[in-house]
């Protein structure tokens, strides 16, 4: 089980007027949580309760979910438990609405919505664990006959795999990520803004880039027709880090340069 007790919430939430009106609820008490669980018929995971005590639902700045299976989903907000808020577990557009009215499968609890406007939703999936166990987090796609895609083994891991989108992340936020996280962010986002992505890397300083990041930037140069600059980056990578992808990308850059 992955909890959020020591999670850094700085910059996670987008506290706009819309968020306060439709998502963000009052501070929660243990009694509120027990009442919500009784109404829903499920024990809520510890990590979700920790989120509620930090922020009772809301719109997220870190809205891009990426996991190790290369699934990429863009989140709008995470539901709280204040029934007076439209987008909450017990609200007008809450769990009962999506399952009873929109006919999403009754596999658990709708915990977050996406930028699709209701055409795919994020669920706590209790099918394997039962109503008192630790649910997985899945995406249910209405447009694909309510197909179910696993996203994370638990809610804590789901939250920890939310990233800022390329368009919104600051240089400081990007540089605070590990190299693995940087590459994951750059590789998996749909419709990536190459100009901003390259800027994020070059602002670190070419001489400060690891072989992994040099390769990522070189690939972007290849994709934007900057073959000579790509070759220069690939040549900076030492022999020990030249795997099959290095030879492929470097060869591609040389072929592109010869064809100019």
Regions found by a protein language model. Give the residues of each.
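Structural register within alpha-helical repeat arrays
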Residues: 182, 217, 250-252
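Residue at a conserved register position within TPR or TPR-like alpha-solenoid repeats
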Residues: 221, 254-256
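A surface-exposed partner-binding patch
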Residues: 1-118, 176, 182-185, 189-195, ...
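Solenoid-like repeat scaffolds
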Residues: 202-208, 236-241
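Short coil/turn linking the two alpha-helices of tandem helical-hairpin repeats
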Residues: 190, 256-260
């Amino acid at each position: 089980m992955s909890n959020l007790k020591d999670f850094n919430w700085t910059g996670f939430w987008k506290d706009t007027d819309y968020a306060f009106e439709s998502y963000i609820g009052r501070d929660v008490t243990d009694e509120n949580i027990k009442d919500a669980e009784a109404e829903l018929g499920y024990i809520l995971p510890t990590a979700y309760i920790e989120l509620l005590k930090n922020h009772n639902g809301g719109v997220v700045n870190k809205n891009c979910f990426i996991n190790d299976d290369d699934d990429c989903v863009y989140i709008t907000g995470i539901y709280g438990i204040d029934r007076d808020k439209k987008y909450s577990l017990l609200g007008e557009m809450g769990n009962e609405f999506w399952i009873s009215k929109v006919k999403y499968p009754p596999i658990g609890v709708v915990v977050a919505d996406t930028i699709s406007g209701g055409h795919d939703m994020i669920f706590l999936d209790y099918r394997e664990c039962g109503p008192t166990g630790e649910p997985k987090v899945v995406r249910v796609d209405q447009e694909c006959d309510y197909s179910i895609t696993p996203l994370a083994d638990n809610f804590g891991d789901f939250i920890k795999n939310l990233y800022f989108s390329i368009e919104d992340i600051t240089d400081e936020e990007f540089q605070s990520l590990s190299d693995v996280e940087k590459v994951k962010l750059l590789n998996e986002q749909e419709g990536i803004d190459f100009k901003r992505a390259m800027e994020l890397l070059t602002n670190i300083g070419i001489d400060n880039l690891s072989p992994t990041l040099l390769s990522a930037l070189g690939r972007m140069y290849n994709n934007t027709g900057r073959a000579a600059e790509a070759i220069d980056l690939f040549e900076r990578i030492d022999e020990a880090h030249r795997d099959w992808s290095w030879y492929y990308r470097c060869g591609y850059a040389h072929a592109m340069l010869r064809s100019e």
